[in-house]
């Protein structure tokens, strides 16, 4: 009886672990086709990233945002400006356990005073960025 209990417990544990592994790796795989998308945004001075993306910020006279990556990921990006904050995110239901950062986003703005990084990826400040006060 004890052997059967150990056997069933081991089987249950194995199935649970396998199911957990499948759940972690869920989400769409990146396509091999790449695309670039330019976003029309209003001026901002803060960046909040909740997407699995690598961001490169360049200080410049114009405000622009451009993303490149797999053509099945880029259309899922949600890019908007609200209260002077550039917000970058993705549909949580489709990319709940998405851990890859195959998306690259180039951001240019004259002023930057706040950065919030909540997604997988990195934020790089390209060249020199002149700020009075920067909160990260």
Language-model features: locations:
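Bacterial N-terminal signal peptides
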Residues: 10-20
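Positively charged n-region of N-terminal signal peptides that target proteins for export
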Residues: 1-7
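Acidic (Asp/Glu) and glycine-rich low-complexity loops/linkers
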Residues: 2, 21-50, 54-118, 122-135
């Amino acid at each position: 009886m004890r052997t059967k209990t150990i056997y069933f417990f081991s089987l249950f544990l194995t199935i649970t672990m396998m199911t957990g592994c499948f759940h972690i790796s869920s989400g769409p795989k990146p396509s091999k086709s790449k695309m670039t998308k330019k976003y029309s945004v209003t001026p901002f001075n803060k960046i909040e990233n909740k997407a699995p993306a690598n961001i490169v910020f360049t200080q410049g006279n114009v405000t622009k945002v451009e993303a490149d990556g797999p053509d099945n990921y880029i259309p899922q990006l949600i890019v908007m400006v609200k209260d002077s904050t550039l917000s970058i995110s993705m549909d949580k239901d489709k990319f709940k356990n998405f851990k890859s950062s195959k998306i690259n986003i180039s951001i240019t703005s004259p002023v930057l005073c706040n950065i919030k990084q909540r997604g997988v990826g990195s934020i790089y400040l390209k060249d020199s960025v002149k700020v009075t006060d920067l909160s990260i």
